């Protein structure tokens, strides 16, 4: 079916990011230090800001500003991105390479975050548990969709290392409102 867009926004990550201060186990995005930036990145960013009205996120990543905006708009928003991290946000999503639209339910978003807490995120140098990929993470979490139960299963998998669970969760969690930092669920 045809779809119409009333408005849209584009977000780019700025230079500062609170996650660099949270990461103590290994440097956040430390695996990218020696990798050169694409040759025309600065020109492209400038063009997107000037010609397309892209906004630059300062102090947080573009993923956070997208998540905040999507949370405010609810089902009146479609997140268009290839970034799997955004699948922890409830709502409509669209993968423009696969031409695939899908809806993430609240319980799916929650499980996505806790799965990442187990697997880590190699792209951002967030170390998960050794030899735990999506399949093993799914076995650890089972059919659980209750956040406290998910947290307890992750904590058990980390052999009670609450500090490491907290660090990974705070690195992986995308903000739903400005300044938000993930905290463990309360009993």
Model-predicted segments: where are they?
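Non-catalytic, usually N-terminal nucleic-acid engagement modules in DNA/RNA processing proteins
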Residues: 1-22
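Extended two-metal-dependent nuclease catalytic cores across DNA- and RNA-processing enzymes
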Residues: 3-5, 29-186
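A short secondary-structure junction motif
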Residues: 17-30, 177
């Amino acid at each position: 079916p045809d779809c119409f867009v009333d408005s849209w926004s584009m977000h780019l990550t700025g230079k500062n990011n609170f996650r660099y201060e949270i990461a103590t186990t290994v440097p956040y995005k430390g695996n990218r230090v020696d990798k050169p930036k694409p040759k025309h990145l600065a020109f492209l960013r400038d063009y997107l800001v000037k010609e397309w009205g892209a906004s630059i996120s300062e102090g947080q990543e573009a993923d956070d500003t997208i998540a905040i905006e999507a949370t405010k708009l609810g089902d009146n928003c479609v997140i268009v991105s290839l970034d799997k991290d955004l699948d922890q946000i409830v709502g409509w999503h669209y993968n423009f390479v696969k031409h695939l639209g899908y809806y993430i339910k609240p319980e799916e978003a929650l499980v996505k975050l806790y799965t990442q807490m187990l697997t880590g995120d190699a792209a951002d140098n967030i170390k998960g548990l050794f030899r735990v990929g999506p399949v093993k993470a799914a076995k650890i979490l089972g059919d659980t969709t209750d956040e406290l139960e998910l947290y307890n299963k992750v904590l058990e998998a980390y052999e009670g290392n609450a500090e490491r669970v907290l660090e990974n969760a705070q690195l992986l969690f995308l903000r739903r409102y400005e300044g938000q930092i993930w905290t463990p669920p309360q009993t």
